[in-house]
């Protein structure tokens, strides 16, 4: 059933929940998540947030129950492959890959085990909560194996005698190390993504989605950019600009107290490292300020 309000599914709890909510708030969507409520209404836009389990989000999109969803690509692809195998709807539109929620699905083995490549996994029993992604990879490399399906605590499976290896999400590798495991193969790299259901939308929803996407782009650009202010010798301006790749043409203003220097203001999309600041100083720049940017719109 379609409504006039834009319905967005986000993870109720977990690694993507806070960052998805924070992104929406930075885009100007006002809402207040309280208690165990499953539906939260925006205070200033015709938007409803559905707080659900992450593995339910792809299905809600593919069945057309909600309009948009924030989801990890690993969960999205696992559900897509599963629904495709079952003959269920599995189509969606990927609107934007986001800059958070990065992880990888990896096969891990005993830390003392020698490993020379995927062929060493032949005949092994591999524990995972992502059987479809694991099967897709093992089929691609042509290695036979068996699956031990678990819903949690996958990393303990080898020590418990349930499996020879595991396929699980890895961020830093600390959990693997704590359980005597090492990463052998990366089989899927993932980030958070914003997806949309297929089908028609009315004009108001199309306009609202476009507004959100534009604002998300602005938030992401701002996160990747810095506002730089400095004083510089006028004759060194070209050399200073060359040290700041990714910068637009700067705003250059005369200094009232020193006619030989100018004030330079610019936005740079590159990280400004200490070495660069030291090089700027060597060229005669002073009062160098590097500031974060909250929002941008081109």
From Swiss-Prot:
It catalyses: 1-(5-phospho-beta-D-ribosyl)-ATP + diphosphate = 5-phospho-alpha-D-ribose 1-diphosphate + ATP. It is found in: Cytoplasm. Its cofactor is Mg(2+). SUPFAM superfamilies: GlnB-like (SSF54913), Periplasmic binding protein-like II (SSF53850). InterPro entries: ATP-PRT_HisG_long (IPR020621), ATP_PRibTrfase_cat (IPR013820), ATP_PRibTrfase_CS (IPR018198), ATP_PRibTrfase_HisG (IPR001348), HisG_C (IPR013115), N-reg_PII-like_a/b (IPR011322), N-reg_PII/ATP_PRibTrfase_C (IPR015867). Keywords: Amino-acid biosynthesis, ATP-binding, Cytoplasm, Glycosyltransferase, Histidine biosynthesis, Magnesium, Metal-binding, Nucleotide-binding, Transferase. PANTHER family: ATP PHOSPHORIBOSYLTRANSFERASE, ATP PHOSPHORIBOSYLTRANSFERASE ATP-PRTASE. This is ATP phosphoribosyltransferase. It comes from Vibrio campbellii (strain ATCC BAA-1116).
């Amino acid at each position: 059933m379609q409504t006039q309000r834009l319905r967005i599914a986000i993870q109720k709890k977990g690694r993507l929940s806070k960052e998805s909510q924070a992104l929406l708030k930075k885009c100007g969507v006002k809402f207040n998540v309280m208690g165990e409520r499953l539906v939260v209404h925006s205070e200033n836009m015709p938007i409803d947030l559905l707080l659900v389990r992450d593995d339910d989000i792809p299905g809600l999109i593919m069945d057309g129950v909600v309009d948009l969803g924030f989801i990890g690509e690993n969960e999205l692809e696992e559900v897509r492959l599963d629904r495709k195998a079952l003959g269920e709807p599995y189509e969606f539109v990927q609107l934007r890959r986001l800059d958070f929620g990065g992880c990888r699905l990896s096969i891990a083995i005993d830390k003392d085990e020698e490993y020379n490549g995927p062929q060493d996994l032949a005949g092994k029993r591999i524990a995972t909560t992502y059987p479809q992604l694991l099967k897709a990879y093992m089929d691609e490399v042509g290695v036979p194996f068996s699956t031990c399906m678990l819903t949690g605590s996958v990393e303990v499976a080898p020590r418990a005698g349930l499996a020879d290896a595991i396929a699980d999400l890895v961020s830093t590798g600390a959990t693997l190390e704590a359980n005597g495991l090492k990463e052998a193969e990366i089989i899927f790299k993932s980030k958070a993504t914003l997806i949309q259901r297929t089908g028609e939308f009315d004009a108001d929803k199309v306009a609202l989605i476009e507004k959100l996407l534009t604002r998300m782009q602005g938030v992401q650009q701002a996160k990747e950019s810095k506002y730089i202010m400095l004083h510089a010798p006028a004759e060194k301006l070209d050399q200073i600009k060359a040290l700041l790749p990714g910068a637009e043409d700067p705003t250059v203003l005369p200094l009232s107290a020193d006619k030989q220097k100018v004030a330079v203001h610019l936005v740079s999309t590159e990280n400004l490292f200490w070495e660069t600041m030291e090089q700027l100083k060597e060229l005669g720049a002073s009062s160098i300020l590097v500031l974060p940017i909250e929002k941008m719109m081109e």
